[in-house]
Swiss-Prot record:
Protein name listed in UniProt: Divalent metal cation transporter MntH
Family, per entry: Belongs to the NRAMP family.
GO molecular function: cadmium ion transmembrane transporter activity; manganese ion transmembrane transporter activity; metal ion binding; symporter activity
Function description: H(+)-stimulated, divalent metal cation uptake system.
Cell compartment(s), UniProt: Cell membrane
Membrane topology classification: Multi-pass membrane protein
Species, as recorded: Levilactobacillus brevis (strain ATCC 367 / BCRC 12310 / CIP 105137 / JCM 1170 / LMG 11437 / NCIMB 947 / NCTC 947)
PANTHER family for the chain: NATURAL RESISTANCE-ASSOCIATED MACROPHAGE PROTEIN 2, SOLUTE CARRIER PROTEIN FAMILY 11 MEMBER
Gene name for this UniProt entry: mntH
One Pfam family cited in the UniProt record for this chain: Nramp
Keywords: Cell membrane, Ion transport, Membrane, Symport, Transmembrane, Transmembrane helix, Transport
Keyword Transferase: no
UniProt feature, compositional bias: Basic and acidic residues: 1-15
C-alpha cells in the first residue's frame, strides 16, 4: 500500500477527516446525540444500537445449517469452536469500530485512499461480490421462510424480500435509531425462539458446559475439523468489518477532543461486545438444538426445509414435535433474513460510496445494491422452477465468495489500525497487533481450505 500524504492538522495525535470527501453514510453520520457529562448507564444507552446491526451478520441464515449440523453430528463438542469464533469476532469488530471513530472514515474509504486506482477497483469488485454473496444468503433465507410460513412461491418470496429496500429508505428518513430498534427486535425474536426450543429439548447441561472446553478431537477428526472450519470461516463476515467502521460514526461527539474519542471507543466496544455475546448465545443455541434433538437420528438436515419438517416429526425429535416448533423456526429464519438484509444493504452503500465515491440519489444507490444481489436468485428460481434444493445450493456457492473476500477486508483492517500515522495513540498495541495478524493468517488458511473442499465436493 502506498503512502498517503495528508495536509490536515492533527490534535491529540489523531487524524481528522482527510480531504473534503463525503462522510461515511453521510445522511446519518453524527446524527445520534450523546449526552455530555452523563453517567455510565446513560452514556452506554446513547451508544447502544450499532452493535445489534453488527451482530446479525454473525447469526444470518448462512450460518444456521453449519451450526445445527455440527450439533447433530458431533453433539456438543464443537461449542468450543463457537466460543473461539465469537472471541475472534469481538476483537476484529472492536478494531473496525475504533478505525471509524478515530479517522472519521470507513474501511472502504481508507482502502481507496491508500491504494492505486487499479488495486482499488479490483478490491471494490471483490468486495461487491462479497456483498452480493451475503445478500443472496439472506434473500434465500427470507424467501424460504415466507414459503414455509405462508405458502408463497419462492419467486414471490424473493420479490417481497427484495422490496424491503423501500422500507429501509423510509426508516433512514425517520432516523438511525429506528433502524437499530427494529434490528434489535428481530434479534430478540431469534434469541427467544431458539431459547424456547432448547428449553423444550432439555439438553444435558453438564455435557453442554463440557462442550465449551477445548478438545483435541476437533483437530484429529477430519469430519469434525471440516465442520469446525465451516463455523470459524463463516463467523467473520467481510461486510461487517466495513459496516462497523461506518456506523460507529453515527454518534455525535467531539473528534478533536481526546477524551471524547476515548469515550466513544470505550462505549462502542462495550455495545459491540454485548451484542456479539448475544450472537454467541444464538449460535450456541443452534448447535445445542441440533445436538439435543438430532444427534444419533441419522436425519438429513442439510436444508432449511429438512429442519422445518423434522421439528414436527415425532419419530425424529420425539414427544416435543409439533407444527408450532416448525413455525417458530420459520419465524426465526424470517427475522434473521430480514435483519440481515437491512444491514447488508447499508454495507452495500458504504462499499459503493467508499471505494468508487459514486454520486447518485440514495434511493437509486440502494436499489442498485439490492438488484445486484437479487438478480442471480431470481434467475436461479426461474431456471429450476422454484426448487428449494437448487436455490439452497446457490446459498452454498455464495459462502465461497465470502471466504475469498475475507482477506481483502481483514488485512487492510489490521494494517490501518496498527498504523501510528493513522491512529496515533489509538493504534493497536503490540499484543493486539500480533494477535490480529495471527488471526488473519489462520482465518485465511482456514478459508482457503474451505474453498478447496467446497469446490471438490461440488465436482
Amino acid at each position: 500500500m502506498k503512502n498517503h500524504e495528508t495536509d490536515t492538522k492533527t490534535k491529540h495525535h489523531m487524524i481528522e477527516s482527510t480531504g473534503s470527501g463525503q462522510k461515511s453514510l453521510d445522511e446519518v453520520n453524527g446524527t445520534v446525540e450523546v449526552p455530555q457529562n452523563a453517567g455510565f448507564w446513560r452514556t452506554l444507552m446513547a451508544y447502544t444500537g450499532p452493535g445489534a446491526l453488527i451482530a446479525v451478520g454473525y447469526m444470518d441464515p448462512g450460518n444456521w445449517i453449519t451450526s445445527i449440523a455440527g450439533g447433530a453430528q458431533y453433539k456438543y463438542t464443537l461449542l468450543t469452536v463457537v466460543l473461539l469464533s465469537s472471541l475472534v469476532a469481538m476483537l476484529l469488530q472492536a478494531m473496525s469500530a475504533r478505525l471509524g471513530i478515530v479517522t472519521g472514515k470507513d474501511l472502504a474509504q481508507l482502502t481507496r485512499e491508500h491504494t492505486g486506482k487499479r488495486t482499488g477497483f479490483a478490491l471494490w469488485i471483490i468486495t461487491e461480490l462479497a456483498i452480493m454473496a451475503t445478500d443472496i444468503a439472506e434473500i434465500i433465507g427470507s424467501a424460504i421462510a415466507l414459503k414455509l410460513l405462508f405458502g408463497f412461491p419462492l419467486i414471490v418470496g424473493i420479490i417481497i424480500t427484495a422490496m424491503d429496500v423501500l422500507v429501509l429508505l423510509v426508516l433512514m428518513k425517520l432516523g438511525f435509531r429506528k433502524i437499530e430498534a427494529i434490528v434489535a427486535t428481530l434479534v430478540a425474536v431469534i434469541l427467544f425462539v431458539f431459547l424456547y426450543e432448547v428449553i423444550l429439548a432439555q439438553p444435558h447441561m453438564g455435557e453442554v458446559l463440557k462442550g465449551y472446553l477445548p478438545s483435541s478431537t476437533v483437530v484429529t477428526n477430519h469430519g469434525m475439523l471440516y465442520l469446525s472450519l465451516g463455523i470459524v470461516g463463516a463467523t467473520v463476515m467481510p461486510h461487517d468489518l466495513y459496516l462497523g467502521s461506518s456506523i460507529s460514526q453515527t454518534r455525535s461527539f467531539d473528534r478533536k477532543n481526546r477524551k471524547s474519542v476515548a469515550q466513544a471507543i470505550k462505549f462502542t466496544t462495550i455495545d459491540s461486545n454485548i451484542q456479539l455475546t448475544l450472537a454467541f448465545v444464538v449460535n450456541s443455541l443452534l448447535l445445542i438444538l441440533g445436538a439435543a434433538l438430532f444427534f444419533g437420528t441419522n436425519s438429513d438436515l442439510g436444508r432449511f426445509v429438512d429442519l422445518f419438517n423434522a421439528l414436527s416429526d415425532s419419530q425424529i425429535v420425539g414427544a416435543i414435535a409439533s407444527p408450532m416448533l416448525s413455525m417458530l423456526f420459520a419465524l426465526a429464519l424470517l427475522s434473521s433474513g430480514q435483519s440481515s438484509t437491512i444491514t447488508g444493504t447499508l454495507a452495500g452503500q458504504i462499499i459503493m460510496e467508499g471505494f468508487i465515491n459514486l454520486k447518485m440519489p440514495l434511493w437509486a444507490q440502494r436499489l442498485i445494491t439490492r438488484l445486484l444481489s437479487v438478480t442471480p436468485v431470481i434467475i436461479f428460481a426461474i431456471i429450476y422452477h422454484g426448487n428449494e434444493a437448487k436455490i439452497e445450493d446457490l446459498l452454498t456457492f455464495s459462502q465461497v465468495f465470502l471466504s475469498i473476500a475475507l482477506p481483502f477486508a481483514m488485512i487492510p483492517l489490521v494494517i490501518f489500525t496498527s498504523s501510528k500515522k493513522l491512529m496515533g495513540e489509538f493504534a493497536n498495541r503490540t499484543w493486539s497487533k500480533i494477535l490480529g495478524w495471527i488471526i488473519a493468517v489462520i482465518l485465511i488458511i482456514l478459508n482457503i481450505y474451505l474453498i478447496l473442499n467446497t469446490l471438490h465436493i461440488v465436482q
